[in-house]
Swiss-Prot record:
<dbReference type="Pfam" id="PF00162">
    <property type="entry name" value="PGK"/>
</dbReference>
<keyword id="KW-0547">Nucleotide-binding</keyword>
<dbReference type="InterPro" id="IPR015824">
    <property type="entry name" value="Phosphoglycerate_kinase_N"/>
</dbReference>
<dbReference type="InterPro" id="IPR036043">
    <property type="entry name" value="Phosphoglycerate_kinase_sf"/>
</dbReference>
<dbReference type="InterPro" id="IPR001576">
    <property type="entry name" value="Phosphoglycerate_kinase"/>
</dbReference>
<feature type="binding site">
    <location>
        <begin position="60"/>
        <end position="63"/>
    </location>
    <ligand>
        <name>substrate</name>
    </ligand>
</feature>
<comment type="subunit">
    <text>Monomer.</text>
</comment>
<keyword id="KW-0963">Cytoplasm</keyword>
<protein>
    <recommendedName>
        <fullName>Phosphoglycerate kinase</fullName>
        <ecNumber>2.7.2.3</ecNumber>
    </recommendedName>
</protein>
<dbReference type="GO" id="GO:0004618">
    <property type="term" value="F:phosphoglycerate kinase activity"/>
</dbReference>
<feature type="binding site">
    <location>
        <position position="151"/>
    </location>
    <ligand>
        <name>substrate</name>
    </ligand>
</feature>
<keyword id="KW-0324">Glycolysis</keyword>
<dbReference type="GO" id="GO:0006096">
    <property type="term" value="P:glycolytic process"/>
</dbReference>
<dbReference type="GO" id="GO:0043531">
    <property type="term" value="F:ADP binding"/>
</dbReference>
<keyword id="KW-0067">ATP-binding</keyword>
<dbReference type="GO" id="GO:0005829">
    <property type="term" value="C:cytosol"/>
</dbReference>
<feature type="binding site">
    <location>
        <begin position="22"/>
        <end position="24"/>
    </location>
    <ligand>
        <name>substrate</name>
    </ligand>
</feature>
Length: 399
């Protein structure tokens, strides 16, 4: 696994530990709707508590332009306290004398949560002075926010210049499973890539085409490949000006014996009228058709590939699963992946912005797969081989 400093063998007794997590979670009317990211942070928090540390938790939430009560992390405190089975005190700021006073007063094994980091514009500016003020609160820094580690923000990368810095358990798990999935020795390895904008995923597609045996494409990304193959896609969504990029993906896939799998049949709506749902062969798509899901023949092909695979990576939905008439492809493939995982035949790693929603739509949970990543953009960045400032900053601790 990637060599980064971790907290397991650190003497943290009596030390103030600044723990960066990602509590940017769905909240409606002040109530947490999906606590997955909070749950993922618990092993690290419990380890710090048991080690006798003073735990100071920091996170961002949403994209505030200024202080906004609707984007306050106070909305997370109750859920965190309940899941941790321990009182968590909330502080309505993240830097300054008031925060320092609270930190000075906390005892070992206490846990406090500071206010939204993004209430200060300096967080996203990777401002050194802001990072230094955060660092002044603690003796040690721990990054447990893989899902933010692709960003060069003050609490992710700059802060490591001022404190001894380590990786938490969630971040380590993310890296371990992602590395395992793309370097799996047993074959075949399959990647499923869906979603809308192909330009944001080209680097990932090229990297995957070098490593996997099957590259299964869905969503608007598949539309682009159909169009590239001179297949009419009607009024379906696609991205212009990417043919040269698609050519690169195809060329690299051919060189590495990677089979690109695109739909053979599709479910369409006419003129984006979602109340119509018609099955067509891809070569029979009409000018007013909008492709919104895969058809049964494509589903059968993908299911057979998954059933024969030893490892699988999945990023992005296969169809417009938010609409029940066009959710079948995503849901049924999810179920096949889950079934193969439960039988011990498949190592499955799933990630990306819509992953948890798609898993929920299939009536499944993250326990039905080997690993479900908390990262959206970070998952994409890692698979694309991009430098991740948060990870690079931790690696620099070893130099």
């Amino acid at each position: 696994m990637m060599n980064i400093p971790n907290i397991e063998n650190c003497d943290l007794h009596g030390k103030a530990v600044l723990l960066r997590v990602d509590f940017n979670i769905p909240i409606k009317n002040g109530k947490v709707h999906d606590a997955t990211r909070v749950l993922r942070s618990l092993p690290t928090i419990r380890h710090l508590v048991n080690a006798g540390a003073k735990v100071i938790i920091i996170s961002h939430f949403g994209r505030p332009r200024a202080k906004d009560n609707n984007l306050s992390l106070k909305n997370v405190v109750k859920t965190l306290s309940q899941l941790l089975n321990k009182e968590v005190k909330f502080v309505d700021d993240c830097i300054g004398k008031k925060v320092q006073k609270v930190v000075n007063a906390i005892a070992i094994r206490d846990v406090i949560l500071l206010e939204n980091l993004r209430f200060y514009k300096e967080e996203e500016q990777n401002d050194a002075n802001f990072a230094k003020q955060l660092a002044s609160l603690a003796d040690v820094y721990v990054n447990d926010a893989f899902s933010c580690s692709h960003r060069a923000h003050a609490s992710i990368s700059r802060i490591t210049e001022f404190l001894p810095s380590y990786a938490g358990f969630c971040l380590q798990d993310e890296l371990r499973y992602l590395e395992k999935a793309v370097s799996f020795e047993a074959k075949p390895i399959t990647a499923i890539v869906g979603g809308a904008k192909i330009s944001t995923k080209i680097k990932m597609l090229i990297r995957l085409a070098e490593k996997v045996d099957y590259l299964v494409l869905g969503g608007a990304i598949a539309n682009n490949f159909l169009l590239f193959n001179k297949v009419n896609i009607g009024k379906s969504f696609f991205q212009n000006g990417v043919d040269s990029l698609l050519h690169d993906v195809v060329k690299i896939a051919d060189k590495n014996n990677c089979k690109i799998v695109i739909p053979e049949d599709v479910l369409i709506a006419v003129n984006s009228d979602y109340s119509t749902c018609i099955l067509r062969k891809t070569e029979s798509v009409l000018d007013n058709d909008v492709i919104l899901d895969i058809g049964p023949q494509t589903l059968s092909t993908i299911s057979s590939i998954v059933a024969s695979s030893k490892a699988l990576l999945w990023n992005g939905p296969i169809g417009v699963f938010e609409h029940s008439a066009f959710a079948n492809g995503t849901i049924e493939v999810m179920k096949v992946v889950s079934d193969s995982t439960h039988k011990g035949k498949l190592t499955s790693v799933i990630g990306g912005g819509d992953s948890l929603s798609a898993i929920n739509a299939a009536g499944l949970t993250d326990k039905d797969f080997t690993y479900v990543s908390t990262g959206g953009g970070a998952f994409l960045s890692w698979l694309s081989g991009d430098k991740m400032p948060g990870i690079a900053a931790l690696q620099s601790m070893l130099n």
